[in-house]
Structure formats: structure tokens, C-alpha cells
Amino acid sequence: MTAPFAIRRLNAADPDFGRHLDHLLSWESVSDDSVNQRVLDIIAAVRSRGDAAVVEFTQRFDGLQAASMADLILPRERLELALTRITVAQREALEVAAERVRSYHEKQKQGSWRYTEADGTVLGQQVTPLDRAGLYVPGGKASYPSSVLMNAIPAKVAGVSEVVMVVPTPRGEINEIVLAAACIAGVDRVFTIGGAQAVAALAYGTESVPRVDKIVGPGNIYVATAKRHVFGQVGIDMIAGPSEILVVCDGQTDPDWIAMDLFSQAEHDEDAQSILVSPDAAFLDRVADSIARLLPTMERAEIIRTSLEGRGALIQVADQAQACAVANRIAPEHLELSVADPESWLPEIRHAGAIFMGRYTAEALGDYCAGPNHVLPTSGTARFSSPLGVYDFQKRSSIINCSAEGASVLGRTASVLARGESLTAHARSAEYRILDEKEA
């Protein structure tokens, strides 16, 4: 017999609300010492033995019999074949989603700029793409073609010359729709490897796997730990925590809609977090009833139940101002403003990965096909970080081109500051370029 469902209820008027909220939001990665050491050993092996180590780990962890790295490379023709092996509806959905993602990210492209000062000195900024990006994609039946689109398309829009995808194929299991997504997104090379060994291969390069400049994409605790260790050798997107959603509702949305929106994140895994905030206590009761009634109808009911009971909450607030204060404190990955006039709320929202405005804007639309990226900051990091975008695959270089007059004027200032820091060579380097009065 299934136990009665119970989700945490909080009230922002409670004197201990802050402490209870902190407890609700607390989450620590489970990367313990044993995981950390295993990852370090794998990275060291890949650095020293290259392809041989990658093949060995792939055989051991993925149950895949490969004689050499040649068996772990998928040519472009294989990606094109995948397009013919998925349904017409799947291909059309991928193409629609890809076009919307591409169109949105085209608007994020940053351009170079410069300006000229009165003395002829030119200052500016040059924007250039990364040479090569690595994309990690989880493998097996539970893999996510939408993640391929969201990670690869911004890189190609940015002008990255080569996108290298790694995707494990446990026991040889290949997900055709993931390969089809890679084809549509413009992925250049695919290796059927995964885990920490794939991250290490991308970061340091092997005889077959080219070294990349940045690694993006989700993965398990071994992948996340490996990304943390190779950061600095390469760039990474983020160390993502569990998925999360915060719904703020005025009490006028269908409670079944809200319940299903909460489920949409809770079904990811047991650590996912789904929270509803509303000033209407009776509405919170109705949503709780909807959750209890709809939960048994869900395919992933036990995962949803564990997530909601362990990390979910229904929070009552006094008004819009308090709701926004709670939202900013949580800084959620996904924020739904399921209210009558979401535009009036927007100026008060400072911290959120993505903001879904109005009753009709389900978070699931953003996950797949709205256009904005679904790779978002989690665990409160929206306080200081942003969604993945084109700018993550571009670099900026400062441009300084001094005229003789400009170098002379700046040289005097630089000399004073350099000598104040006792850096004589700096000072003299600037002073050599100072014009004497008859030259000026």
C-alpha cells in the first residue's frame, strides 16, 4: 500500500522561516573522497597513456568491446544515417527546435568595437570565437537530444570551428535521436566515450581525441568531478546541481497545471527541487490535492514523490513584494511567474536562470523549443551567473594602438605609477616614448 503523500508547508510569516528555507535549499554534491581519487587516477592515466587508457576504461565501464579508438569514432555519415532512422515527427520537432534555438542565439552575438581619441590613439575590443569546443552528452536510453541542440548550436553561432561531441554507448547502445540532433546542430566529430575518461581526453587530448578549449554539457558525479579538476586547463560551462523550479502563483491558475509544472522538474531525479509560492493558502491546499491525485498517474511517480517529499515545498507569503523577496533569496534555475500581470513583477526579480512569464508559459517549453538556452545556473548560482549562450564560446581581446602623441601623454602617467610600484623597467619603457618638447 502506498503511503499518503506529504509535502512540506512553510509560511514566510513564521519567525523561523529563514532557517527553514535555508535547510530546504541546502544541497551538497556527493563527490566523496573515493570518487575524487578515482577521477584523479583516470585523468592521470589518460594524460600518460592517451588512447590506450580511454579504450581500457570504455571497455571496463561501458561494457563495450573496442580494439582501438577507431572503433569509438562515429563518422559524419553515421550521424546522417541517424536522421533516416528516427520518425518524421521526431525529425521535424528537432528541426523546429534547432531553428528556434539558432534564431534566439544569433541575437546574442557580440561584435568587435573601437574608438579613436583626439590624439589619434585607438582603443577597442576584438571578439573572437574559441577554436574548438567539447560537448559531453549522457548516453544510453535516458540521453537528451535537446541538450545536444542547446550546447552545440550556440557554439556554432559563435563561430567555433570544431565542436567535438563525446557520448557513451553502454553495451553498444546507441541513441539514434541524439545522433540525429548532433547532425542537425552541426557537430563536427563524435566519439562514443564517456565518464571522466572522456572529459580528460577532451581536456588534454590524445592521439585521436583533439584537445578542446572548453567543455560543456551535463553528466553524472564522475563527469562533474572531472570537469572540476580540468578547469583551468580548459574552460567549463558550470558544475550543475539538481534541476529546480520555483513557481510563483497568484492563486488564479488551474491547480492541475501548477502540479504538473512542479512534476516536470521533480521527475528528473530524487534530488530535484520543486517549490510553489503563493499568497493564497486555499490555493496551496488545492495544489496539494492536485499533486496527490495526479501523482499515481505519472510514469516516474516514485522519483517525483521522493523529490517532492524530500526537497519540495508549498510556501505561503503575504504579498507580491514578499513573493519576490523569497524568489530572489532562492535564485532558482527556473522561475515561473504564473500571475495576471507578470510584466509588473519583472523589475523586482533580480536572480533567476530563466523567467517564464504568464500562466501559459510552461517551463517545459523552455526545456525544448522556445529558443532560450536550457543550460541554466542551479543551486542559487543565478545570483552571479547566467544561462549558457553564445558569449560562452567567444573571447574578448583588448585593442590599444597609441599614436606618438598618445604614447607621450600616457607615458608620463604610466611612469609615475610604475615608479610608485618600484617597477623601474616599466617606467623606463614608457619614458622612452615620451616626446621632448620640440618633438611634441
UniProtKB/Swiss-Prot annotation:
One of its GO terms (biological process) is L-histidine biosynthetic process. Substrate binds at residues 243, 265, 268, 334, 367, 421, 426. Zn(2+) binds at residues 265, 268, 367, 426. It catalyses: L-histidinol + 2 NAD(+) + H2O = L-histidine + 2 NADH + 3 H(+). Its cofactor is Zn(2+). PANTHER family: HISTIDINE BIOSYNTHESIS TRIFUNCTIONAL PROTEIN, HISTIDINOL DEHYDROGENASE HDH. Binds 1 zinc ion per subunit. Gene3D superfamilies: 1.20.5.1300, Nitrogenase molybdenum iron protein domain (3.40.50.1980). Keywords: Amino-acid biosynthesis, Histidine biosynthesis, Metal-binding, NAD, Oxidoreductase, Zinc. One of its GO terms (cellular component) is cytosol. Catalyzes the sequential NAD-dependent oxidations of L-histidinol to L-histidinaldehyde and then to L-histidine. Pathway: Amino-acid biosynthesis; L-histidine biosynthesis; L-histidine from 5-phospho-alpha-D-ribose 1-diphosphate: step 9/9. This is Histidinol dehydrogenase. It is an enzyme of class 1 (oxidoreductase). GO terms for molecular function: histidinol dehydrogenase activity; NAD binding; zinc ion binding. The gene is hisD. It comes from the Bacteria. InterPro entries: Ald_DH/histidinol_DH (IPR016161), Histidinol_DH_CS (IPR001692), Histidinol_DH_monofunct (IPR022695), Hstdl_DH (IPR012131). It comes from Pseudomonas aeruginosa (strain ATCC 15692 / DSM 22644 / CIP 104116 / JCM 14847 / LMG 12228 / 1C / PRS 101 / PAO1). Its EC number is 1.1.1.23. The keyword Cytoplasm does not apply. The active site is at 333 (proton acceptor), 334 (proton acceptor).
